[in-house]
C-alpha cells in the first residue's frame, strides 16, 4: 500500500454534501409509495392531515437539533456510540452496536429489495414480481453499492449528489404538477381544498396516531451522529445543513401531499399501494411507466448512504476495543472496507433469508429506545456537568419533547398490536451479552482470529489508520 498519503478518515465533506446527505436520509420511499398513514388517521380530513404534516416538521426539528448537539460535542464518525459509552458505560454502547448491526443490515436489505422490485415491476405489469429475480437483483445492487462505497469518498460524493438532485427533481415535478392543476381551477381538483376541514374531525387517539405517522416520515435527522468525523467544521456545518434541509423537506412534503390530493381523492390514496404510480397514471397516463424507474433510481441514493453511514460505528467500535481489530482498518482509498464488507454480508443474508426481514420490522422500535437513552444522556450531562463547556446546546424542552414522542413510538405498537416477536427482539438485543462478557469484559483473545486478521490485511490490502492530528 502506498503510504505517501495518510490513511485515515478525512474531513472532506462540506455544507452542500451534508445538506444533500440529510435530504436523502430523511426523504425515503414512503413519500412515493404510501404517504397515507397521516391521511388515514386524520379521518380523511384534508385540512387536519396537512396541519399534522407541518406540525411533525417542528417536532422533527427538535429531535434533529438534539442529535446535532451530540454530533458537535463529539465530532467523530459514530458519535452516538461514543456518547452512549461515555454516559451509560461500555455495556450499553456495545448493545447499541449489536442492535445496529442487525438493524443496519436489515435496512440495507429492505432498501435493496425495494429498489429491485421497482426496477423489475415494469416488466411484470399484470402480476407481482417473482421472488427469485428480485432477490438476485437486490443482491447484485447491494454488492455494487458496497464496492462503490469502498472506493472512497469521491465515488460516494458524485453518486449521492446526482441521486439527491434526481429525487428532489421528481418530487418537484409532482409538486409543480399539483400547483398547475390547482391554478387551472377544475372543480374536481380544488373542491377538496375549498372545504378542507369539513370532513369528520379525528378524535385525540387518532390524532396522536397521525402525528406518530408523520413524525416517522421525517425520521433520519440523527444521521450526523454517524458521519460527523468526516464533515469539515462540524460546529458550523451541521446546524447550517439542518436549517437548510428540514425546511426544504417540509415544503416538499406539503406540496407533494397537496399534489396527490389534487389529482386523487382521499379514498383513492388510501386504497393505493404505490401512490406516486397511481398519481402518474391519473395525471400523465402515457408516462406512468417511467415512474417505477424514477423511484428505483432515487432509492439507489438511500441504499448508498445507508451503507456509508452504518459502517462508521463499526469502525469506531473497533477503535474503542469493542470489536476485533480487523474492523479498525482502512483500504488505500481511506474507506473502512472490512466494516462495509461485514454490513453487506449481513444484508445479503437478510435478503436470502426473508424471515429475517420480518424480524427486522420489529427491531425498528428499538431505534426509539436508543433515542430515548440519548435524550436522557443529554439531560444527564446538563445535570452532572453543569459547568462543562458545550459548543452547541439545545433548549431542555427539546430533548423532553423528543422523549415523549419516542416513548409513544415504543408504547403504541406494544399496546396496539402486542406480539411475541417483541420478546424475541429483546432477547436478540440481550444476546449481545454472550459476546460482550467473554470477549470484551474478560478480554479473551482468539489466536485463530488474529492469524486470520493478518491474512485478510494482505488479501484486501488494508491497514490500521494513521494517528489523527485532532
From Swiss-Prot:
GO molecular function, a single term: protein heterodimerization activity
Cystine crosslinks: none
Catalytic activity: L-cystine(out) + L-aspartate(in) = L-cystine(in) + L-aspartate(out); L-cystine(out) = L-cystine(in); L-aspartate(in) + L-glutamate(out) = L-aspartate(out) + L-glutamate(in); L-aspartate(in) + L-glutamine(out) = L-aspartate(out) + L-glutamine(in)
TM region(s), chain numbering: 12-32, 46-66, 88-108, 129-149, 163-183, 207-227, 241-261, 288-308, 337-357, 359-379, 394-414, 422-442
Membrane side Extracellular: residue ranges: 33-45, 109-128, 184-206, 262-287, 358, 415-421
Segments on the Cytoplasmic face: 1-11, 67-87, 150-162, 228-240, 309-336, 380-393, 443-470
Subcellular location(s) of the protein: Apical cell membrane
Membrane-topology annotation of the record: Multi-pass membrane protein
A cellular-component GO term for this protein: apical plasma membrane
Keyword Transmembrane included in the entry's annotation: yes
UniProt xrefs under InterPro entries: AA/rel_permease1 (IPR002293), AminoAcid_Transporter (IPR050598)
GO process annotations (BP): amino acid transmembrane transport; aspartate transmembrane transport; L-cystine transport; L-glutamate transmembrane transport
Entry superkingdom: Eukaryota
Signal sequence range: none
Keywords: Amino-acid transport, Antiport, Cell membrane, Disulfide bond, Membrane, Transmembrane, Transmembrane helix, Transport
Self-association state and partner proteins as the record states: Disulfide-linked heterodimer composed of the catalytic light subunit SLC7A13 and the heavy subunit SLC3A1.
General function of this protein: Associates with SLC3A1/rBAT to form a functional heterodimeric complex that transports anionic and neutral amino acids across the apical plasma membrane of renal epithelium. Preferentially mediates exchange transport, but can also operate via facilitated diffusion. May act as a major transporter for L-cystine in late proximal tubules, ensuring its reabsorption from the luminal fluid in exchange for cytosolic L-glutamate or L-aspartate.
Name of this chain's protein: Solute carrier family 7 member 13
Gene: SLC7A13
Amino acid at each position: 500500500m502506498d503510504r505517501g498519503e495518510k490513511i485515515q478518515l478525512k474531513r472532506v465533506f462540506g455544507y452542500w454534501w451534508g445538506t444533500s446527505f440529510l435530504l436523502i436520509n430523511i426523504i425515503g420511499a414512503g413519500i412515493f409509495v404510501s404517504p397515507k398513514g397521516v391521511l388515514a388517521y386524520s379521518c380523511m380530513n384534508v385540512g387536519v392531515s396537512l396541519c399534522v404534516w407541518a406540525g411533525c416538521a417542528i417536532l422533527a426539528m427538535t429531535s434533529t437539533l438534539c442529535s446535532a448537539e451530540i454530533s458537535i460535542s463529539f465530532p467523530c464518525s459514530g458519535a452516538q456510540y461514543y456518547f452512549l459509552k461515555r454516559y451509560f458505560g461500555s455495556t450499553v454502547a456495545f448493545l447499541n452496536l449489536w442492535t445496529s448491526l442487525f438493524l443496519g443490515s436489515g435496512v440495507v436489505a429492505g432498501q435493496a429489495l425495494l429498489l429491485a422490485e421497482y426496477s423489475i415491476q415494469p416488466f411484470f405489469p399484470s402480476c407481482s414480481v417473482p421472488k427469485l429475480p428480485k432477490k438476485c437483483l437486490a443482491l447484485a445492487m447491494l454488492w455494487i453499492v458496497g464496492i462503490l462505497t469502498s472506493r472512497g469518498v469521491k465515488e460516494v460524493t458524485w453518486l449521492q449528489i446526482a441521486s439527491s438532485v434526481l429525487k428532489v427533481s421528481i418530487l418537484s415535478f409532482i409538486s409543480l404538477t399539483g400547483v398547475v392543476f390547482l391554478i387551472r381551477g377544475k372543480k374536481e381538483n380544488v373542491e377538496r381544498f375549498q372545504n378542507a376541514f369539513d370532513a369528520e374531525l379525528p378524535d385525540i387517539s387518532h390524532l396522536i396516531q397521525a402525528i406518530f405517522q408523520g413524525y416517522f416520515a421525517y425520521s433520519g435527522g440523527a444521521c450526523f451522529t454517524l458521519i460527523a468525523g468526516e464533515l469539515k467544521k462540524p460546529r458550523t456545518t451541521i446546524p447550517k445543513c439542518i436549517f437548510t434541509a428540514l425546511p426544504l423537506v417540509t415544503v416538499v412534503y406539503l406540496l407533494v401531499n397537496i399534489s396527490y390530493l389534487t389529482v386523487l381523492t382521499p379514498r383513492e390514496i388510501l386504497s393505493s399501494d404505490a401512490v406516486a404510480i397511481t398519481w402518474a397514471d391519473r395525471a400523465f397516463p402515457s408516462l406512468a411507466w417511467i415512474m417505477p424507474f424514477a423511484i428505483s433510481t432515487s432509492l439507489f441514493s438511500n441504499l448508498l448512504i445507508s451503507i456509508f453511514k452504518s459502517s462508521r460505528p463499526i469502525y469506531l467500535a473497533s477503535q474503542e476495543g469493542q470489536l476485533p481489530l480487523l474492523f479498525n482498518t482502512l483500504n488505500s482509498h481511506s474507506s473502512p472496507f472490512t466494516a462495509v464488507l461485514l454490513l453487506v454480508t449481513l444484508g445479503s443474508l437478510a435478503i436470502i433469508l426473508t424471515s429475517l426481514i420480518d424480524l427486522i420490522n420489529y427491531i425498528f422500535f428499538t431505534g426509539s429506545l436508543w433515542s430515548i437513552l440519548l435524550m436522557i444522556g443529554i439531560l444527564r450531562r446538563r445535570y452532572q456537568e453543569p459547568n462543562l463547556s458545550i459548543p452547541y446546546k439545545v433548549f431542555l424542552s427539546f430533548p423532553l419533547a423528543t422523549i415523549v414522542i419516542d416513548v409513544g413510538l415504543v408504547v403504541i405498537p406494544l399496546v396496539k398490536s402486542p406480539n411475541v416477536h417483541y420478546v424475541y427482539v429483546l432477547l436478540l438485543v440481550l444476546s449481545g451479552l454472550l459476546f460482550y462478557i467473554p470477549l470484551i469484559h474478560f478480554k479473551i483473545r482468539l489466536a485463530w482470529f488474529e492469524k486470520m486478521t493478518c491474512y485478510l490485511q494482505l488479501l484486501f490490502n488494508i491497514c490500521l489508520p494513521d494517528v489523527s492530528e485532532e
